[in-house]
Amino acid sequence: MAAQARAITLPTLPEPLEACASQTALVVIDMQNGYLSPGGYLDLAGFDVSGTPPVIERAAQVLQAARRAGLMVVHAQNGWSPSLAEAGPRRSPMWHKSNPLKYMRAHPGSQLLIRGTWDHAIVEALQPLPHEPVVHKPRYSAFAGTNLEMMLRAHGITTLVFVGVNTNVCVETAVRDAFHREFFAVMVADATLQAGPPSVYESSVFNIQKFFGWTATTADMVAFLEGLAAPGAEAIAP
């Protein structure tokens, strides 16, 4: 069921955000084994992934509620083809700053965030439905080198709700880029997880609320979206 074309007020901070249901989309960022699972890229790179199970659960709750409410859903999936052509050579800053690329150079034969591998795959609880577009992104931002903006504009989307990982890297970068492209951006903060100490999560929340968009909690967003859903509507399991 498509979202209804009516004015809504999202339960956000630092203030409620007015939007239109039919012009609002959920963007799920990088919910992949590499970022969320033991033995994945982030774990191998030395980051703490012990906090991922509740984040997966909360992101899945938002996803299911968005589906019931009829919102457009887009999944962003980070990685590269086996040739690593999109990653760039030494002259690219990505070559120097990408942790998975650095790990693979130090461990020949390893395959992190390579399309078709377990590391690149989206976790079971957040699997896209057949009609939900997947944006394959080669950089931190879901807008960089992808067709995301074109697709959102074509569908008349003006407001974006974000869940996913990592708060301070790919999610915040997407929120910033959305702001600079004149989208209203909302991060469901507790449905994201940072790469690094809790302080970087707090910094991202501060930055977004003060400069680039709005934040919400999973409980508030799910309750709101459930209110938009048609009576008796059920989420479609992946």
What are these regions (language model features)?
Residues 38:
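A short, glycine/acidic-enriched catalytic loop
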Residues 73-76, 187:
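A structural signal for short, well-ordered beta-strand segments and their strand-loop junctions
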Residues 29-30:
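N-terminal nucleotide-binding beta1-loop-alpha1 segment
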Residues 41-51:
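Short glycine-enriched, charge-decorated loop/helix-capping segments at active-site entrances
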Residues 56:
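Glycine-rich loop(s) and the adjacent beta-strand/alpha-helix scaffold that form part
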Residues 75-84, 90-91:
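Catalytic-core segment of enzymes that process non-peptidic bonds
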Residues 1-25, 34-35, 52, 61, ...:
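Active-site-adjacent betaalpha module
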Residues 33, 59, 77-80:
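Short glycine-rich, polar/acidic loop-and-turn segments at beta strand-coil junctions
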